[in-house]
């Protein structure tokens, strides 16, 4: 079917069933219930064999759910970003990471699924494959599966514009630990949008990785209640983390206005 063709009735019905499968699965997930093929089929009034006409396995079911969750996350952080002009990437990135935190705290089970689930044989195979390739772009920090690539690309775009505007210090190759340089070195891939800047270096990708690790670590600790509740309700730990990252990215002088954005 061409991209402009009108879906047939059968195709529309099949898509509607997929949408219902994802909706029911997410409802089960949000209520802390088992998201199994049997449970989903029961909620939909189907037999398990009937559900297998749409999904082949539990892994495929969870992949469908994960893609839907990532789409929602990217949608929310996009709305937050777009409240600020493109020539203010500092405001955009603070607004986006704050929206990500709010989403995570409000959707703990979905956060657990896409950001904190233990590896499966399928995801381990993807990770092993990715480990054989050097990271040459910011959005190459996340393997392209389950919608995670779009999430990473969203932040890599803002991060690149931040560097273009603020020119924050980036470590040279000889300042990076050997193990880090080995992972981050390699020829740029044809068509990489970042390669057109002529400025993407292992040090820049390392800065991106470190910023994400600190942000993700803080949000994960908050989501699972591994810090004092007062730090979560006040947002103090998150704000301190964003400020620490901001210092590395040349934004310390703008913290007063950015803090107001972080508090939303």
Predicted feature locations:
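Short hydrophobic/aromatic patch on the recognition helix
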Residues: 45-55
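Short N-terminal edge-element motif at the start of the domain
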Residues: 62-89
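C-terminal peripheral helix-coil segments that are non-catalytic and often amphipathic
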Residues: 153, 157-264
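Amphipathic alpha-helical interaction segments
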Residues: 20, 39, 92-95, 99, ...
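Amphipathic alpha-helical segments used for helix-helix packing
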Residues: 107-142, 164-181, 220, 228
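Basic, helix-initiating cap at the start of DNA-binding domains
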Residues: 1-34, 39, 56-63, 68
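Hydrophobic alpha-helical connector segments
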Residues: 80-110, 146-154
């Amino acid at each position: 079917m061409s991209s402009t063709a009108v879906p047939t009735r059968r195709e529309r019905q099949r898509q509607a069933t997929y949408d219902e499968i994802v909706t029911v699965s997410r409802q089960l997930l949000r209520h802390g219930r088992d998201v199994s093929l049997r449970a989903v089929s029961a909620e939909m009034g189907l037999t398990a064999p009937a559900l297998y006409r749409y999904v082949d396995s539990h892994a495929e079911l969870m992949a469908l759910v994960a893609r839907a969750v990532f789409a929602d996350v990217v949608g929310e952080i996009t709305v937050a970003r777009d409240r600020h002009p493109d020539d203010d990437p500092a405001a955009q990135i603070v607004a986006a990471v704050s929206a990500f935190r709010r989403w995570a705290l409000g959707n703990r089970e979905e956060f657990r699924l896409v950001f904190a689930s233990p590896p499966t044989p399928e995801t381990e195979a993807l990770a092993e494959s990715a480990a054989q390739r050097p990271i040459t772009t910011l959005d190459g920090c996340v393997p392209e599966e389950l919608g995670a690539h779009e999430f990473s690309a969203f932040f890599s775009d803002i991060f690149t514009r931040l560097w273009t505007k603020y020119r924050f210090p980036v470590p040279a190759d000889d300042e990076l630990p050997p193990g880090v340089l080995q992972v981050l070195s390699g020829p740029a891939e044809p068509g990489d949008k970042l390669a057109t800047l002529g400025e993407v270096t292992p040090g820049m990708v390392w800065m991106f990785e470190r910023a994400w690790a600190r942000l993700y670590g803080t949000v994960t600790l908050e989501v699972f209640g591994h810090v004092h509740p007062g730090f979560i309700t006040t947002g103090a730990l998150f704000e301190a983390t964003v400020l620490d990252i901001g210092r590395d990215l040349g934004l310390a002088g703008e913290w007063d206005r950015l803090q107001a954005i972080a508090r939303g």
